Design a protein with these regions (language model features):
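Glycine/threonine-rich beta-strand-loop-alpha-helix active-site module
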Residues: 90, 159, 530-645
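Conserved C-terminal structural/oligomerization subdomain of aldehyde/semialdehyde dehydrogenase
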Residues: 34, 322-458
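N-terminal Rossmann-like NAD(P)+-binding subdomain of aldehyde/semialdehyde dehydrogenases
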Residues: 2-108, 136
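Rossmann-like NAD(P) dinucleotide-binding subdomain of oxidoreductase/dehydrogenase enzymes
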Residues: 98-239
Length: 871
């Protein structure tokens, strides 16, 4: 043992030193490659393919003579495949520099080589695999260093040399193709584990492939194949037998994709067997099967005896002491099961074939699955059938990356001859076979693709109801609205008491054709999920084709919820309330509304803007009185009627509160990260109208002022429906859900503090492509200037706007703080962190001009509760 360790110690430095020499040369080649363009590379690869093709017979002969395995004529075909088919499949591949430049979608793809590649080649396909790997490496500007199988060193090196000389002659760097001259495990391991080897292309025995994968770097390897071939009763039997024999005898079965077991359905078993025998297959008897097992399989490993790999059937029979007719192509053994108790069910890489008889197609599929699971996971499987249903069942069950239908497996597996698979001599087996790829390996696996992405802005939108009617008595539209026969009015008790429901019914009764009318008047402030459910039940009975939401925000929100559940009863409320970053990309898609009923919104307050928005706020009173803003453009009404007749008699407090809600909508829309040219004008006009008319509207009830505020509400609604809101509403939603204060009043108390917070430089910036940089403070100052407030600097403008809002609140009789409303500070402090956390969760937070921290939201709550201002 000491002598062995000493010898190993001496060998290690030599292996490392030798490997480093190869690596240093490869590095120089790698640098030189970077100066070549696509045209130069393509000329080099073509020259390599031509050189390999020119010597394909010479190399085939060398391979057979050196390895003592395979069939000369088939080696010729393999070498032609490795040159002609491989070159044809990669010649148009872009592998150098810019491979895609998409000006429309603003990205660019740049291909770069992965780096120095180590190529491991097998004894079974030595020259063809060398040609294949060298060509795809040079196509991608990667130097490659080969570690050839010792039993095929000379022929493999000759193949590499022929391609290298052709490559250099046509402009490739020296040493772009190298190989270990005197192979040893030390040198192979040193090369595999060298830190400058970027990738290993491993084709060989499972031990070698596993070693490659254990090197801690990307490896593209091939798992073993134990390929079942199921011949189902509807198959073309002549073709199936032809394909089976063609494939299994190709290079004496040394293609890893070759069939290892044939599974035949009982009704056709005798016919298939007869055809196989007629074409040179020899079915061994029980005694001969025992001899074949002993000679072909190493018992303790249940693995093929290397002696028989790639040998002709007659020679294998002779080695096993079995007499067979001259010209025997395949030795076939009928066996009963799969696994270690049935050694011939393993991969054999020779013209030795296991055979099974099955009663049904289902049994055939299950037997094929067993064969794959016994050492062939991920590789290939074959079915011969003309029954599409059976083919699909087979495909669904097989854990293989290549499922070949009605074709020879050897030729089908390597691709492009019998199918559209990429031509390759390295066949990935995916995670089934512990491989990193499930595809046929080719040039595209050997490049790093860098994606250069230019900044893009999201497509935005402007969505409002199809029809908006305004001016006094515009409710008269209902008398002529087309295509309605059954109308359900959703409202609250006060609308009935004030006679507003009667006004709506009056116009409906003026229609030439009478309509059926039903009223749901039980909507409470902050409508609950229970109310929505009750209204939905009424709709289900009445079956309206038109829903009229009459009232303030609560009836409209409730009606929208009822509309949704009426048309789609199975909709999940839990999914509806989920947040989104981009409304077009939300995980849960709202169903398309309007299939059963049109939706008409008639606001009787001047605040929510719900008549033109895609929002509805529903309160889940069974789970903490949480307000959930539902948002989707499907919730946008079909018709909005902005009739000031409904707001002339509103009480002062309601006008004040809802008016400040309008102002909050407009200001938040103007500073939103999604604010745009289409919403800015609406927002500014709404702000101007509020400052010009709200005080007069609330304190005197002037009709013109009421009308202007009614219009301002809708203008602000259209603005925030498309630019969205911010934390003012997030905070108000959660506060209102807990303490049940009027929504507009809550917004009004919060607004000065939110503006002051939003105008400060962010702790965290908001993410929205069009929002180039933080400008909320400047936008607030712009509002101040438009209103004629002092704003010589941005800071002065922000302060002026805050002062103007506080002054307006005082004039309207709105308290400065939440504490003035009578709430207990201790109770507030016990809840504030929870409320801040829920406010962050609110959908409105996503469009705020800066991303708030939860702790910052809690401080805004405290400022509004205690009235703290930094003057």
């Amino acid at each position: 043992m000491a002598v062995k360790n000493e010898a190993a110690a001496k060998a290690q430095p030599d292996a490392q030193e030798y490997t480093q020499t190869l690596i240093d040369k490869a590095k120089k080649a790698s640098e030189a490659f970077m100066g070549l363009d696509q045209e130069q590379i393509d000329k080099i690869v073509q020259a390599m393919a031509l050189a390999g093709l020119d010597k394909h017979m010479y190399l085939a002969k060398m391979a057979v003579e050196e390895t003592g395995r395979g069939v000369y004529e088939d080696k010729i075909i393999k070498n032609m495949f490795a040159t002609e088919y491989i070159h044809n499949s990669i010649k148009y591949n872009k592998t150098v520099g810019i491979i895609e430049d998409n000006a429309y979608e603003s990205f660019q793809k740049i291909a770069e080589p992965v780096g120095i590649i180590m190529g491991i080649t097998p004894v079974t396909n030595p020259t063809s695999t060398t040609i294949f790997k060298a060509m795809i490496a040079i196509k991608t500007r990667n130097p490659i260093i080969f570690g050839f199988h010792p039993s095929a060193q000379r022929c493999s090196a000759e193949a590499a040399k022929i391609l290298l000389e052709a490559a250099i002659k046509h402009g490739a760097p020296a040493d772009c193709i190298q190989w270990i001259e005197n192979p040893s495990m030390d040198r192979t391991n040193a090369l595999m584990n060298h830190p400058d080897v970027a990738c290993i292309l491993a084709t060989g025995g499972s031990a070698m492939v596993k070693a490659a994968y254990s090197c801690g770097k990307p490896a593209l390897g091939v798992g073993p194949g134990n390929v079942p071939c199921f011949i189902e009763k509807t198959a073309d039997l002549d073709q199936a037998v032809n394909d089976l024999i063609l494939s299994k005898t190709f290079d004496n079965g040394m293609i890893c994709a070759s069939e290892q077991a044939v599974i035949i359905e009982e009704p056709i078993f005798d016919q298939v067997k007869k055809k196989m025998i007629a074409n040179g297959c020899y079915f061994v008897n029980k005694e001969e099967a025992a001899k074949l097992t002993a000679g072909a399989i190493i018992a303790d490993k249940c693995a093929v005896n290397p002696t028989i790999v790639g040998q002709p059937a007659t020679k294998i029979a002779e080695l096993c002491g079995i007499e067979v007719p001259a010209g025997t192509k395949i030795l076939v053994a009928e066996i009963e099961g799969v696994g270690t108790k049935f050694p011939l069910s393993a991969e054999k890489l020779s013209p030795v074939l296991a055979c099974y008889k099955v009663k049904t197609a289902e049994q055939g599929i299950e037997r094929a699955l067993e064969v794959v699971q016994f050492g062939g996971m991920g590789h290939s499987s074959v079915i011969h059938s003309n029954n599409d249903e059976i083919i699909q069942k087979f495909s669904d069950r097989m854990p293989t990356c290549r499922i070949l239908v009605n074709q020879p497996s050897s030729q089908g597996g390597i691709g492009d001859i019998y199918n559209t698979n990429l031509p390759s001599l390295t066949l990935g087996c995916g995670s089934y076979g512990r491989n990193s790829t499930s595809s046929n390996v080719t040039a595209v696996n050997l490049i790093n693709v860098k994606r250069v992405n230019r900044r893009t802005v999201n497509m935005q939108w402007f969505k409002i109801p199809d029809k908006i009617y305004f001016e006094r008595n515009s409710t008269q539209y209902l008398a002529k609205m087309p295509d309605i026969t059954r109308v359900l009015i959703v409202t609250d008790p006060m609308m009935v008491k004030l006679g507003y429901v009667e006004r709506v019914e009056h116009y409906l009764r003026q229609r030439q054709t009478p309509v059926a009318i039903e009223v749901f008047a039980d909507v409470e402030p902050d409508p609950s999920t229970t109310t929505v459910q009750r209204g939905t039940e009424l709709m289900a009975k009445f079956q309206p084709d038109c829903i009229i939401a009459l009232g303030g925000g609560s009836p409209m929100d409730a009606a929208k919820g009822m509309w949704l559940f009426y048309e789609y009863p199975d909709t999940d409320f839990h999914n509806l309330k989920q947040k989104f970053m981009d409304i077009r990309k939300r995980i849960y898609k709202y169903p398309r509304l309007g299939q059963k009923a049109k939706f008409v919104a008639i606001p009787t307050t001047s605040g929510t803007g719900s008549e033109v928005t895609s929002f509805a706020v529903i309160t889940d009173k069974e789970n903490g009185n949480t307000k959930y803003p539902l948002a989707d453009y499907e919730l946008t009404p079909d018709v909005a009627i902005i009739d000031p007749e409904f707001v002339y008699s509103l009480p002062k407090v309601a006008v004040a509160d809802t008016g400040m809600d309008v102002l909050t909508h407009a200001i938040e829309a103007y500073v939103s990260v999604m604010a745009n040219d289409f919403t800015d004008g609406l927002a500014i006009k709404a702000i101007q109208l509020v400052f010009q008319y709200l005080e007069q509207s609330a304190l005197t009830g002037d009709k013109l002022a009421r009308e202007k505020m009614h219009n301002a509400s809708t203008l602000a609604g259209m603005a925030f429906a498309n630019a969205f809101l911010g934390i003012n509403h997030s905070l108000a939603h959660k506060w209102g859900g807990q303490y049940h204060t009027a929504h507009g009043r809550t917004n009004a108390i919060l607004m000065p503090h939110v503006i002051r917070y939003n105008a400060k430089k962010p702790t965290k910036f908001a993410a929205w492509p069009k929002y180039r940089s933080f400008v909320a403070d400047e936008r607030y100052a712009e509002i101040a200037r438009i209103l004629g407030l002092p704003a010589r600097t941005t800071e002065e403008g922000v302060k002026s706007l805050i002062k103007a809002i506080r002054d307006l609140n005082r004039k309207l009789g709105i308290p400065e703080t939440f504490q003035e409303l009578g709430f207990d500070p201790k109770d507030f402090e016990s809840r504030v962190d929870y409320l801040a956390d829920r406010a962050f969760e609110d959908q409105c937070t996503t469009a705020n001009p800066k991303l708030p921290l939860v702790t910052e939201l809690a401080e805004v709550y405290r400022d509004a509760f205690y009235g703290r201002f930094d003057e």
